[in-house]
Design a protein with these regions (language model features):
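Active-site loop/lid in soluble adenylation, ligation, and acyl-transfer enzymes
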Residues: 1-145, 258-288
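Coil-to-beta-strand transition motifs
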Residues: 18, 93-95, 196-199, 211-214
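Intrinsically disordered, low-complexity acidic/polar segments
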Residues: 30, 109-110, 211, 225-227
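Surface-exposed helix-capping loop/turn segments at secondary-structure junctions
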Residues: 58-63, 187-199, 212, 283-288
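Conserved metal-phosphate-binding beta-hairpin within the catalytic cores
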Residues: 100, 199-220
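Anionic ligand-binding catalytic core segments
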Residues: 114-115, 123-172, 216, 220-282
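A long amphipathic alpha-helix within ATP-dependent nucleotide-binding catalytic cores
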Residues: 166-200
Length: 288
C-alpha cells in the first residue's frame, strides 16, 4: 500500500471509509525533517495520543477508531506498523492550529519581552520566563505547508479564516475551537501535574465529521506537539528542562551552521529517552 499523504512525521493511508495514520520515527524541528531516525518515537506518539483521546472523550469526540493493528487491513499487521498506527475517522480538517499556552515560554516569552503581549493578548506586567499564566490563553495559527512557517493570528482573524471556508459558520466554529482547546488543556494539564509533568503549551487540530460535528483529530498532547516540563525543580526566571523535542531544538540552535540538520547519536538517544520517560510518567505504563 502507498500513503495518500506524507507529512513531516506521519503517513496517511486510505482505508475506504476510514484512514490509517502511521507515526514514523522521523523527527522535524523548525519545520525541517531531520536526517535522524529516532527508534520508537512513532510508537510513543501514537500510544500517547490514544491515552489522551481515551481520557478526554467526555469533552469532545475524537477521530480514533482503533490503535490495534488487528482491526486494520492485513498490510498493517507486520512489525513495522504495530504500535505506531491508528485507524481514524475521515474528517474535513479545519484550517486552524489551536494553540493553548498555560506558561510563558518560547516565542511567547520573546514577544512578551518586546511589548507585554503574546499573539496580541495583553498579559500582566512583571512576568518572568516560564511563569504560569493567570489563565491559559488561546493563540491560534494558520496551517503551513511543509517548509513554510505557521503564522500566529488573533481570535478575530481565526473567525475570518473559518468564515471564508465555511460561510455562516466562522464565529460558531472559532468559538467552539477556542472553548474545546481550553477545556482539553485544563483537564489534561491538571492530570499531568499530578503525575509530575507540567504541560507548558500544546496544539490541537480539529475537523468536521460527515454530520458537521467538530471532532478532535491529528495527534494529542505528544512530545512533538507540546512542551512538557518536569514539575520537580520547576523554577520560573529561566528556561526549563523538558521531556519533548525542545532538547533537540536547543542543540540545533546552539550548533547553527554546523549540523546539516542531523543530530549526533547521543542527542538523538537522549531525545527518545525523554519521550519514553514522559510516556511512562503520564500513563503509568512502560511502552510495549
Amino acid at each position: 500500500m502507498k500513503p495518500i499523504k506524507e507529512g513531516k512525521v506521519r503517513e496517511i493511508y486510505d482505508n475506504g471509509d476510514s484512514l490509517i495514520m502511521v507515526a514514523t520515527d522521523r523527527i522535524s524541528c523548525f519545520d525541517v525533517i531531520l536526517k535522524n531516525i529516532i527508534s520508537k518515537k512513532g510508537t510513543v506518539l501514537t500510544q500517547m495520543s490514544k491515552f489522551w483521546f481515551d481520557l478526554t472523550e467526555d469533552i469532545v469526540p475524537n477521530h480514533m477508531i482503533s490503535a490495534d493493528v488487528k482491526d486494520m487491513p492485513e498490510f498493517f499487521q507486520q512489525p513495522a506498523y504495530d504500535g505506531n498506527s491508528m485507524m481514524c475517522r475521515k474528517l474535513t480538517m479545519l484550517p486552524i492550529e489551536c494553540i493553548v499556552r498555560g506558561y510563558i515560554t518560547g516565542s511567547g516569552w520573546a514577544s512578551y519581552q518586546k511589548n507585554g503581549t503574546v499573539c496580541g493578548i495583553k498579559l500582566p506586567e512583571g512576568l518572568q520566563e516560564s511563569d504560569k499564566l493567570p489563565e491559559p490563553i488561546y493563540t491560534p495559527s494558520t496551517k503551513a505547508e511543509i517548509g513554510d512557517h505557521d503564522e500566529n493570528i488573533s481570535f478575530e482573524q481565526s473567525v475570518d479564516v473559518l468564515e471564508k471556508e465555511f460561510p455562516g459558520k466562522g464565529k460558531e466554529y472559532a468559538e467552539k475551537l477556542r472553548d474545546y482547546t481550553i477545556a482539553l488543556y485544563k483537564k489534561c494539564a491538571d492530570y499531568a501535574l499530578k503525575k509530575g509533568i507540567i504541560i507548558a503549551d500544546t496544539k490541537f487540530e480539529f475537523g468536521l465529521d460527515e454530520n458537521g460535528n467538530i471532532v478532535l483529530g491529528d495527534e494529542m498532547l505528544t512530545p512533538d506537539s507540546s512542551r512538557f516540563w518536569p514539575a520537580k525543580g520547576y523554577e520560573p526566571g529561566h528556561g526549563q528542562p523538558s521531556f519533548d523535542k525542545q532538547f533537540a531544538r536547543d542543540w540545533l540552535k546552539e550548533n547553527e551552521g554546523n549540523h546539516d540538520w542531523e543530530l549526533p547519536e547521543d542527542v538523538a538517544k537522549k531525545t527518545i529517552d525523554k519521550y519514553l520517560e514522559a510516556y511512562e510518567l503520564l500513563t503509568g505504563e512502560k511502552l510495549k
